[in-house]
Structure formats: C-alpha cells, structure tokens
C-alpha cells in the first residue's frame, strides 16, 4: 500500500547542469544616514594627590685627588697613553718593465747655404753726387743811422745806508745738569790723642796704690 507520503526524487547532477539556477542581481539598499549624537564632555575634576616624599640618597664622598701641581706627578688624565707605532711592511712595487731603446733615425736636413752678407767692408759705398751750391750775391744793407748818446741828468745824492751787521743765529744754550747744592770743602778734622788713663780733665788723677 502506498502511504500518503510523497517521495520526491532529488535532482541529479545532470539536471543541475542542464537547468542552472537563475542569477538575480543584488538589490541596492541605500545606506541609512544617522545624525551624530552630540554629547557634552563630562567634566572630571583633577584628583589631588599629595607629593610623595622621597628621602635624599646619601652618597659617600668621592675620593679626594690632589691637583697635579701639588703632587707634581704625571697622570693619564693629563698625558695620553703612549702607544708604540704599528709596523706596516713596505709595499713591494714590481720592477718596471725593461723596454729596449727605440732607434730613431737622424732627421736629414739639407745644408744651409749661408750667403755672404753685403757690408761696407766688402763693397765700398758709392760716392754720393752732391749738386753745386747756388751762388747768391750778398745782400747790401744800408748803414745804420748814427744816434748820439743821450745824456741823462744827474741823479739826486742819496746818503749811504746805515750799516747793519748781519743777523746771527742765537747761540744754543749750553746743556747744564740739574741744580745741585754747592759742594762744601771742609778741612780735615784735627786728631787729638786721647789723654792717658786717669788723667781725664773732668776727673782727678787716680793714684795707683798697688792693691
């Protein structure tokens, strides 16, 4: 007996290739524009925190170094460390290639024929022909008119000028040293011998009793 359940046969792969599915373009849905929601900023007061006390770090005093001038010593701080020079072997250059000398034939130059110079020593100069001077008769000049000498009247007698001796230059003052006090020459002191002991003029003579 056939039940009331209808069994549909599943489509085969051949049916799928013969009837491909219908392609539908996607439906365009415009984007929904949502205005931005403006929210005022929330004020958060600053949190006051008391300063954290950090005790000072105790550092031991650094080692005392006297100056170089006091100790008169040489330290590495003042003078660099002496390093011996680095030995660099000499660079060996190859010997130059020996090339035989190139023979150059001498250049042939034709002999130069020096023509003798024509000078006065070889050929004397020809005499220069000068024309005869033109004879010109002397020009006759009439004698000059004789003029008697003009007598000028005697000039007035002027007295001879007073003799004035020539001006001489002022003598240069003699250079004198600065003013010094006069040197006083005093006579030598008269030396008086000392009186004998006990015969001072202010003291009476002392008698020697022999005690």
From Swiss-Prot:
Region (Disordered): 25-211
Residue ranges with Pro residues bias: 25-59, 82-93, 179-198
Keywords tagged on the record: Cell wall, Repeat, Secreted, Signal
Top-level taxon of origin: Eukaryota
Matching InterPro entries: Proline-rich_CW_protein (IPR051308)
Basic and acidic residues biased stretches: 142-159, 167-177
Phylogenetic classification of the source organism: Eukaryota, Viridiplantae, Streptophyta, Embryophyta, Tracheophyta
Designated name of the protein: Proline-rich 33 kDa extensin-related protein
């Amino acid at each position: 007996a056939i039940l009331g359940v209808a069994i549909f046969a599943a489509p085969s792969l051949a049916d799928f290739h013969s009837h491909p599915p219908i392609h539908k373009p996607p439906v365009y849905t415009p984007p929904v524009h949502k205005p931005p929601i403006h929210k005022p900023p929330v004020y958060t007061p600053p949190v006051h925190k008391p300063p954290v006390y950090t005790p000072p770090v105790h550092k031991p005093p650094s080692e005392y170094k006297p100056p170089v001038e006091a100790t008169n010593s040489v330290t590495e701080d003042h003078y660099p460390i002496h390093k011996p020079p680095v030995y660099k072997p000499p660079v060996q250059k190859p010997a130059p290639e020996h090339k035989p000398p190139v023979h150059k034939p001498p250049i042939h130059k034709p002999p130069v024929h020096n023509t003798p110079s024509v000078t006065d020593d070889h050929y004397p100069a020809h005499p220069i022909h000068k024309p005869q001077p033109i004879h010109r008769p002397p020009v006759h000049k009439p004698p000059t008119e004789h003029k008697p000498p003009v007598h000028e009247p005697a000039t007035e007698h002027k007295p001879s000028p007073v003799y004035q001796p020539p001006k001489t230059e002022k003598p240069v003052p003699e250079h004198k040293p600065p003013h010094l006090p006069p040197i006083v020459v005093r006579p030598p002191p008269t030396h008086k011998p000392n009186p004998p002991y006990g015969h001072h003029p202010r003291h009476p003579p002392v008698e020697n009793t022999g005690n």
